[in-house]
Amino acid sequence: MADSSFDIVSKVERQEVDNALNQAAKEISQRYDFKNVGASIAWSGEKILMQANSEERVKAILDVFETKLIKRGISLKALDAGEPQLSGKEYKIFASIEEGISQENAKKVAKVIRDEGPKGVKAQVQGDELRVSSKSRDDLQAVQALLKGQDFDFALQFVNYR
């Protein structure tokens, strides 16, 4: 019987992030507590720029955006938001979307699979993803359940299950 395998990745659909950003921008433009505070959220290159005239308002914009991301099914572990910075008369927060599994994080996941996973399961690092293979599909499902129970500081998705 051939080996079964799946890939562990950390990817975010850019379109879903864009939809969440547009929904947040619409809510910010319509909410009463954001009137006359210069509140806005928009793409700034590959980063997301949130700005308002007070620190509390810019944190509220971040909260609205996080709520929209959750509703769109995007893990907040993929969002890397900085601290509010004063720039002139406005406060700004720059946030970026983290994608890919770093070598260091891939080694952590592989170690968890080796130490706590079923015997006969192999994990190989392939660039910014991890390939997990085994003779038994049940073992692969046990590995998925194990990893879902772990609290990593990055988002994980399981793809390419064969």
UniProtKB/Swiss-Prot annotation:
InterPro entries: DUF520, UPF0234-like_C, UPF0234_N, YajQ-like_sf. One of its GO terms (molecular function) is nucleotide binding. One of its GO terms (cellular component) is cytosol. Pfam families: DUF520. The keyword Nucleotide-binding applies. Keywords: Nucleotide-binding. SUPFAM superfamilies: YajQ-like. PANTHER family: UPF0234 PROTEIN YAJQ. Belongs to the YajQ family. Nucleotide-binding protein. This is Nucleotide-binding protein SAV_4896. It comes from Streptomyces avermitilis (strain ATCC 31267 / DSM 46492 / JCM 5070 / NBRC 14893 / NCIMB 12804 / NRRL 8165 / MA-4680).
